[in-house]
Amino acid sequence: MDPSLSDRGHLLTEQANPASQALDQLSPLELVDLFNQEDQHCLAAVAQAREAIAQAIEYAAQAIARGGRLFYIGAGTSGRLGVLDAAECPPTFCSDPEQVQGILAGGSAAMFRSSEGLEDRAEDGAVAIAEYQIGPRDFILGITAGGTTPYVHGALEAARSAGAKTGFLACVPADQVAIAVDVDIRVPVGPEILAGSTRLKAGTVTKMVLNQISTGAMVRIGKVYGNRMVDVAVTNRKLEDRALRILSDLLSIDRQQAAALLGANERSVKQALLQHWTGLEPAEAAALLTEHQGHLRAAVTAFSSLR
């Protein structure tokens, strides 16, 4: 036996779940009921981590606002979830793809074919930090369900040395795996139904947290007005329909008027709203938005105060 091989049996994510001891004997309906029962732990874990998640949102928003980036880094399921969440930001918020990025051990090939052995190389995590030129303007969140992934620890150590803000997202309590980071998010959801299969509850709760961080950061930097995605990228028919409905709903105009307004404003919903509300020319509305760092509400308030 390799003397350097650590026993991870004490980790919450590696333990056997007493509720699923008869997993191989369950009917399909019983199996579904057990999944639903166990998934309730995800909601409770996220609620317990609310303050740390809120701090991560603030760090991410600050990074993007100052021209930096939000990075997720991980291996296996954890890394893939980071890539997935990052990939959804440009179509939803019309954000620059550089602003939110996922780094996966093994690169793009590992997104589709498992390369789990790569997670053991802490030096590869450090190399990734250098390759992406991560520095003081950036915020990097390391994701590892069991908390021990060397690739993630190597990346976070290198990121801290480079002056970046760092965060850690794990499904084990801090007394099982300690780490020095700026924000430490722990969402212990208990042992998995299939012991050690952290693509299950751990994967679910990880995606819940990432949803909150990326969406919260985009709200903070002005990508949302009310609960509408006013910076939506109008790149297909579904999104064009959504853009027209946003304009129709918020401005009480018909779809034909909404289409004309959108076309006159470079297919920018946010600019179209501001132009309609203020009566400015499209170029003037665009300039006012730029003056207020893209915050529609701030631009409307500033215009109203001058009248």
From Swiss-Prot:
Gene Ontology biological process terms in this record: amino sugar catabolic process; N-acetylmuramic acid catabolic process; peptidoglycan turnover
Positions annotated as active site in the UniProt record: E88, E119
A single MF term (Gene Ontology): ether hydrolase activity
Pathway: Amino-sugar metabolism; N-acetylmuramate degradation
Superkingdom of the organism of origin: Bacteria
Record-linked InterPro entries: Etherase_MurQ (IPR005488), Glucokinase_regulatory_CS (IPR005486), MURQ/GCKR (IPR040190), SIS_dom (IPR001347), SIS_dom_sf (IPR046348)
UniProt-listed Enzyme Commission number(s): 4.2.1.126
Keyword Transcription: no
Function of the molecule: Specifically catalyzes the cleavage of the D-lactyl ether substituent of MurNAc 6-phosphate, producing GlcNAc 6-phosphate and D-lactate.
Miscellaneous section: A lyase-type mechanism (elimination/hydration) is suggested for the cleavage of the lactyl ether bond of MurNAc 6-phosphate, with the formation of an alpha,beta-unsaturated aldehyde intermediate with (E)-stereochemistry, followed by the syn addition of water to give product.
Family: Belongs to the GCKR-like family. MurNAc-6-P etherase subfamily.
Protein name: N-acetylmuramic acid 6-phosphate etherase
Organism: Synechococcus elongatus (strain ATCC 33912 / PCC 7942 / FACHB-805) (Anacystis nidulans R2)
Gene: murQ
